[in-house]
Regions:
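C-terminal cap of thioredoxin/glutaredoxin-like
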Residues: 2-36, 166-275
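Short leucine-rich amphipathic alpha-helices used at interfaces
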Residues: 18, 31, 39-44, 59, ...
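Ser/Thr/Pro/Gly-rich low-complexity linker/stalk segments immediately outside membranes or between
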Residues: 37-55
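Short, flexible loop segments at the rims of nucleotide/cofactor-binding pockets, characterized by
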Residues: 57-58, 88, 187-188
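A short beta-strand-turn-helix
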Residues: 60-77, 102
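Flexible, active-site-adjacent loop/turn segments at secondary-structure boundaries
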Residues: 61, 67-68, 115, 149, ...
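A generic local structural motif
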Residues: 64-67, 96-97, 196-197
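Structural alpha/beta surface segment adjacent to cysteine/selenocysteine redox centers
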Residues: 75, 80-85, 91-170, 200-205, ...
Length: 275
């Protein structure tokens, strides 16, 4: 993957090299083709008359005690990851985000919220409930262990055998019988639905979709970088595609749409942290 280089007329602003932009756009484009337009019956279309509507990032709630949090709640950046456990692009981005977050210590935290795409992955909602049962039986550490293991073993695209769910529970050290009882109860269906409805209200139409909650307003340089990079990527995407990167009006929320590559995600974080 190519690294960043400065534009000659504006030496303090960094932009992606064309090859890197093309790779980013290709990944994003595949994710959009895969997901967008599959949830029309559950909310407004994200594309209308060839013009994408702006995300309503203010609809993404602040982190609370019920969230699945990896890191510190008051971190300068909290990544809210809306994800489908059978989505192949979610599997890619989950690994990418984990790698990026690990390099920032207490500056970046991660929150996971469910967004199963039933029309594409009929198993994803049940798997989301399984992850919630892991949380009930073992707390936050077991939730993340279960989630990480599920992403590691699933072939994606509805390919995971449901018989693997209790095996994953056993693998991460959960009591198999209690897990099976929890999962069969369906007690977490409402929790999954609430995450999904929040995502829809914020403009999520496909997965993966991440919203960065910032403790402080993004700097002018960071906003310029995000806006310019989005414009470059947009040139490689079909007209009317939702924005790949977007900064909310208050400058304290940023969305990332699609399975963006490690280099681009890290550059966004570096800009937001003034590194």
């Amino acid at each position: 993957m190519n690294v960043m280089e400065p534009i000659s007329e504006k030496p303090k602003r960094d932009f992606l090299l064309p090859a890197s932009i093309l790779i980013s756009a290709l990944i994003v484009s595949l994710a959009l083709v895969y997901n967008v337009g599959k949830r029309a019956e559950k909310g407004p279309e994200s594309v209308s008359a060839g013009v994408a509507s702006a995300p309503a990032l203010e609809k993404v709630r602040a982190v609370n005690q019920d969230d699945h949090l990896r890191g510190k709640k008051d971190a300068p950046i909290v990544v809210v990851e809306f994800s489908d456990l059978e989505c192949p692009y979610c599997k890619i981005l989950h690994k990418t985000i984990q790698e990026v977050v690990a390099g920032y210590g207490d500056d970046v935290a991660l929150v996971f919220r469910h967004f199963p795409l039933d029309e594409l992955h009929s198993k994803a909602r049940h798997e989301a409930e399984a992850a919630e049962c892991a949380n009930e039986l073992g707390g936050s550490d077991k939730f993340w262990a279960y989630l990480d293991r599920l992403f590691a073993v699933t072939p994606s695209n509805n390919g995971l055998d449901p018989a693997e769910l209790p095996r994953i529970a056993e693998y991460v050290g959960l009591p198999k019988g209690n897990f099976a009882s929890c999962l069969s109860s369906g007690k977490y269906a409402a929790r999954i639905q609430a995450d999904e409805e929040e995502g829809m209200a914020a403009g999520v139409r496909g997965t993966p979709y991440s919203v960065l909650l910032l403790r402080n307003e993004a700097s002018a340089g960071a906003k310029d970088f995000i806006t310019a990079t989005n414009s470059e990527i947009a040139q490689q995407l079909p007209p009317g595609s939702p924005p790949t990167l977007f900064v909310a009006a208050d400058g304290k929320r940023v969305s990332m749409n699609g399975a963006l590559p490690y280099e681009l995600v890290k550059q966004v974080f570096d800009k937001l942290l003034n590194r």
